[in-house]
UniProtKB/Swiss-Prot annotation:
The gene is psbE. It comes from the Bacteria. Belongs to the PsbE/PsbF family. GO terms for biological process: photosynthetic electron transport chain. This is Cytochrome b559 subunit alpha. It comes from Synechococcus sp. (strain RCC307). Heme binds at H24.
Length: 83
C-alpha cells in the first residue's frame, strides 16, 4: 500500500470488475422498474397523499381558481368548492 493511501480500491478498478457488473446488472434495472411501477400504478399518489392529475380541478371548471383578495383567500376557495 502506498504512503497516504486510504486502503480503498480505485474507482476505475471497481467499475471494470465483473463482480460490479454482475451485481448492478440486476439491481439498477430492478430499481428503475420498481420506481416506474410505483408511479404508473398510482401508489405514489396514495403514499404521499397528493391528488391525482384528474382531481386537481372539478369537471365543471374551465380554468384554475384565482384568489383575488389576499386575506380572504380561504373563504374564496371554500365558496368556489361549495358550488
Amino acid at each position: 500500500m502506498a504512503a497516504g493511501s486510504t486502503g480503498e480500491r480505485p474507482f476505475f478498478e471497481i467499475i471494470t470488475s465483473i463482480r460490479y457488473w454482475v451485481i448492478h446488472a440486476v439491481t439498477l434495472p430492478a430499481i428503475f422498474l420498481a420506481g416506474f411501477l410505483f408511479v404508473s400504478t398510482g401508489l405514489a399518489y396514495d403514499a404521499f397523499g397528493t391528488p391525482r392529475p384528474d382531481s386537481y380541478f372539478q369537471a365543471a371548471d374551465v380554468k384554475a381558481p384565482v384568489v383575488s383578495q389576499r386575506y380572504e383567500g380561504k373563504s374564496q376557495l371554500d365558496t368556489r368548492l361549495k358550488n
